[in-house]
Amino acid sequence: MLKNKHLLDPSDFTIEEFDEIFKLAHQIMTNPKEYQNICNGKILATLFYEPSTRTRLSFESAMIRLGGQVIGFSEPNSSSVSKGESLRDTIKTVNCYADLIAMRHPLEGSAKVASMYSDIPVINAGDGGHQHPTQTLTDLLTIKEYKGNLEGNTIALCGDLKFGRTVHSLIKALSRYKNNKFILISPIELRIPNYIREQILEKNNIEYKEITSLEEGIKEADILYMTRIQRERFVDQSEYERLKDVYVLDEAKMKGAKEDMMVLHPLPRVNEIAYEVDEDSRAFYFKQAKCGMYVRMALMAKLLGEA
């Protein structure tokens, strides 16, 4: 039973619980009218201390489509946080008004702190460069729906692997499925953190390699997961300017990929995927965004005990 559980990290749920969510998400995708009122009377609080378009709107749309309502803020300056209110007090206050919290925060571990003071489920919608579990559910559902299998794939992850919370969460989740291999493509400065390499990949004897060439990595990939170089994570903006255009996926590079390769991106895109790639049948990132809404509908329905 997922009722009243927190989702702070992909490892909080078992593979069987993932499958429960994916099964319900598929049912909602195919028959949305059946689920349009199951969360009637429920309220989601969206607490976004960092900017967001897709994640926030996806959560809001998901709850509204389930018949529920949404309260919250999209920037801390519009809340009592700007007056110095602690995260603890914000969470305890929101518990008085809502049935469920989705929170994005710039500090790693903030979702864990929030869960310690919450009697209602807390969903981590991104905590700094740490984890982004609902994006991971989105990614897994997209692969399952359009690729058919979460096992036995070669996954190339490209771009900002150091600060990219979506990358960290996805590796953590896909490492739990059999026979997956990883190709980690990044500049030296943006390599995957040691804790991912040592505690997840090496500890579990998962095959991986680290390279700097997108052209090399794309040849073997069943799934290519592109990410943007994140300006907001850099202290030195000159370093960002030097690295921001290091990887650009275009049709010329796509010619070196498998015919059935899947291109994913958590979005927003800056210029790491050329617009011409959007017309390629292997581009799945907008389908991925739609899957995000359905998987969040399924997740919230489960956490609220309504499905």
UniProtKB/Swiss-Prot annotation:
Enzyme superclass (EC): transferase
GO biological process: 'de novo' pyrimidine nucleobase biosynthetic process; 'de novo' UMP biosynthetic process; amino acid metabolic process
One GO MF term: amino acid binding
Xref: SUPFAM superfamilies: Aspartate/ornithine carbamoyltransferase (SSF53671)
InterPro entries reported for this sequence: Asp/Orn_carbamoyltranf_P-bd, Asp/Orn_carbamoylTrfase, Asp/Orn_carbamoylTrfase_sf, Asp_carbamoyltransf, Asp_carbamoyltransf_Asp/Orn-bd
Catalytic reaction annotation: carbamoyl phosphate + L-aspartate = N-carbamoyl-L-aspartate + phosphate + H(+)
UniProt entry tagged with the keyword Hydrolase: no
Assigned keywords, A-Z: Pyrimidine biosynthesis, Transferase
Pathway linked to the protein: Pyrimidine metabolism; UMP biosynthesis via de novo pathway; (S)-dihydroorotate from bicarbonate: step 2/3
Sites where the protein binds L-aspartate: K83, R165, R228
PROSITE patterns: CARBAMOYLTRANSFERASE
Keyword Chloroplast attributed: no
EC number: 2.1.3.2
Ligand binding (carbamoyl phosphate): R54, T55, R104, H132, Q135, L267, P268
Entry function: Catalyzes the condensation of carbamoyl phosphate and aspartate to form carbamoyl aspartate and inorganic phosphate, the committed step in the de novo pyrimidine nucleotide biosynthesis pathway.
Family from the record: Belongs to the aspartate/ornithine carbamoyltransferase superfamily. ATCase family.
Assembly, per entry: Heterododecamer (2C3:3R2) of six catalytic PyrB chains organized as two trimers (C3), and six regulatory PyrI chains organized as three dimers (R2).
Official protein name in the record: Aspartate carbamoyltransferase catalytic subunit
Organism: Clostridium perfringens (strain SM101 / Type A)
Originating gene: pyrB
